[in-house]
Amino acid sequence: MRRKTKQGLWAVLLAAAVACLVPTVTAYAIEGWNREGDEWQYLNREDQPVTNAFKKSKDDWFYLDERGFLLKNRIFSFGGDDFYVDQDGRMVRNAWVFIDSEKDPDGNYGDSAWHYFGADGKGLRAKGKGFRKEIDGQAYAFDENGRMLTGWISDEGAVLEDEDPFVNARYYADADGALYTNRWLYYDWGSHLTSEVTGRSYEDYEKMWFYFGADSKKYRSRAGEQPFQRDIDGQTYGFDEKGVMIEWWDKVASISDAVRSNPTSDERVRYYSGYDGGALMKSKWFWMYPSANLDEDQNRDLECSWWRSDAKGRAIRNKIYRVGEKEYAFDGIGRMKTGFVLFDGRHEFVAQYDVDAWDAAHFINGDIYGIEKADLYLFSPDELNDGSMQTGKEITVELADGPRTFAFAPSGKAYGNRNILQKKDNKFYINGLRLDAPEEQGYGVVSQNIGTLDAPQYRFYVVDRNGRIVNGRRVLRAGDGYLLVANGQYVGYCGDEDAPRWKNDAFYHYDRSNRQNHYAGGVVEDMRTPMTKDKVPDELSVFEAD
């Protein structure tokens, strides 16, 4: 009996020793979706519900509210943008949604109205003067809350509902929200006002017609007593200062005096209503519109413009021309052009666009007529007082979607001209536009093809909000994750809670809560594998080279 007891004691001691050799293993929950009663949650690795965040299931995104449950049938703000989730909790994309009190119980978005949510789920809304948005080829207007606008709309995006809303309005939208574009509008409400151009009361008008051009803006006179002239479907029409078509108009005010602020001599000059291409005064500026027999093109644009005569009294045509210390652009019949102007060389006018005719995406994608085969210049939009060529690297231009920075060489040509990405002073430009990171992300990725279209060789650079290229090795906070840079190149992105760390010539996932091994998550991205465009998250892609 005594011997047996001794053997049992040794067995107990041996078992205790073995237990000391086995390391303690911390148990973690499996991250993922969890059903709680009739509702869904998303549990993290600590088995806690994720709150106030988007999570993906297959191809759909879902939002978890402050309680950690799916939000349903609700419009809400997240990260400075508006989103809508349907009755199943899915984020709605590329769709119209009528938002009423049921979908907006707190009344954060004003009166009931239609809203549109794009491919990224973000609701379209006005940002500064950028309230005009295109959806499936049709233009619409939205206010700062994302509500679709209808009726008469001002240049600032305000709906006008006074007695004569057409006076200060620039746009018009029907009940379906579509802005009138290249389209006539018949106004049958009448008015007691008087036209400054014709001196006639609108009560004398049999009908009141308005026309809205390709940019959805109402045609109107900007030259005091002179009508605004346009060829529409082969016929020439005149419009007064309020945009009303002048039905009986032929030509108004044959000769008058005007003073040009800059540039000009101290002498007063004249503008003529019927210039026929003959000799003018020498080396002078003229404010006028051309006569019907000046140009062979029957679809020409007949509006008042500045013209310049040379030393022989001939109108300057189809060239960029120096006057004093400044340069100006003139089209094929001699009209001075302002805004964005395209020339093939310096002696072949191609096209002109108002600065607010396009948004940044059009310059990035090259979706502007003539921009691939012509040189882009910028001439001051202040037609009455300047109009000269603009050069420099920090020129702020008010585009349709807000202010953006452009740069032009001393010659006046845009950096990144003819739709070719250009690196200049540690920044990238395309068609003059500086490529800046999205404001909400802080950093973005620009891909550049240093090879050919048949044999591309891509380089991936990271830029900040001011377009500066990030050099060296960096871990950068971008949106809800981290953007990784090595040797001045983008090498990966991860949405970890903790910032990745550099170790053994690679970026590793880092988990500060894992005390046994902070680097258990392994390498974020194998840098021996070539980077490809599909590894750049859409929200971080600033420019994608062909």
Kindly label every feature range from the protein language model.
Residues 2-546:
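Extracellular adhesion/carbohydrate-binding repeat motifs centered on closely spaced tryptophans
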